[in-house]
Amino acid sequence: MNLEQIYKDCGAYLEGHFLLSSGKHSQFYLQSAKVLEDPKLAAKLCDELAKIITSYKIEFDSICSPALGGILAGYELARACSKRFIFTERVNKEMTLRRGFEVKKSEKFIICEDIITTGGSALESAKIIESLGGIVVGFAALANRGFCAVENLKSPRKDNAKLPENLPLFTLGNFEFEIYDETNCPLCKKGSKAIKPGSRGN
């Protein structure tokens, strides 16, 4: 499966000057919503991701995703794995679990995102699950932006990674994009202004 080509074919592989959710800047952005708007393609991708997770014999009960980006990927992965699905969301900048969702004591979760960059949002969701008595046994995403170690791809962990080193991350592919702090962003130095994805129709 050529994940990069899938993103390009869907118009989801964007080039410009982007402000990422992590606060970093990048010349490239992956707009997974453009990939996941096709239900058949979303099912195909998450069926493949489910096969990878199953092959590692990870035992889990449910899947949780951070809103908003992770919801479609997480729901489709839950469908493919025949598991329960819940999501966390930000309220006043704090990640929370709402909408009547509950976590059972010792319930095992995989945290699923559409894209993992440093893993900050996924880690916030994991901490919510654990604070409610759940157990996080791994992480999953359609793609990794090259910072977190990926179990099935045997890719190394980089300094920016926030996901726990003792838990596996499973993805369909790696996208190796440079990301920058605002202070050393070459695009900023050229006079370009970073755009938050979604703010101008992207």
From Swiss-Prot:
InterPro entries: OPRT, Orotate_PRibTrfase_bac, PRibTrfase_dom, PRTase-like. Keywords: Glycosyltransferase, Magnesium, Pyrimidine biosynthesis, Transferase. One of its GO terms (biological process) is pyrimidine nucleobase biosynthetic process. It catalyses: orotidine 5'-phosphate + diphosphate = orotate + 5-phospho-alpha-D-ribose 1-diphosphate. It comes from the Bacteria. The keyword Repeat does not apply. GO terms for molecular function: magnesium ion binding; orotate phosphoribosyltransferase activity. SUPFAM superfamilies: PRTase-like. Its EC number is 2.4.2.10. Orotate binds at residues 117, 145. Its cofactor is Mg(2+). 5-phospho-alpha-D-ribose 1-diphosphate binds at residues 93, 113-121. Pathway: Pyrimidine metabolism; UMP biosynthesis via de novo pathway; UMP from orotate: step 1/2. Belongs to the purine/pyrimidine phosphoribosyltransferase family. PyrE subfamily. Catalyzes the transfer of a ribosyl phosphate group from 5-phosphoribose 1-diphosphate to orotate, leading to the formation of orotidine monophosphate (OMP). Homodimer. HAMAP family: PyrE (MF_01208). PANTHER family: OROTATE PHOSPHORIBOSYLTRANSFERASE, URIDINE 5'-MONOPHOSPHATE SYNTHASE. This is Orotate phosphoribosyltransferase. It comes from Campylobacter jejuni (strain RM1221). The gene is pyrE.
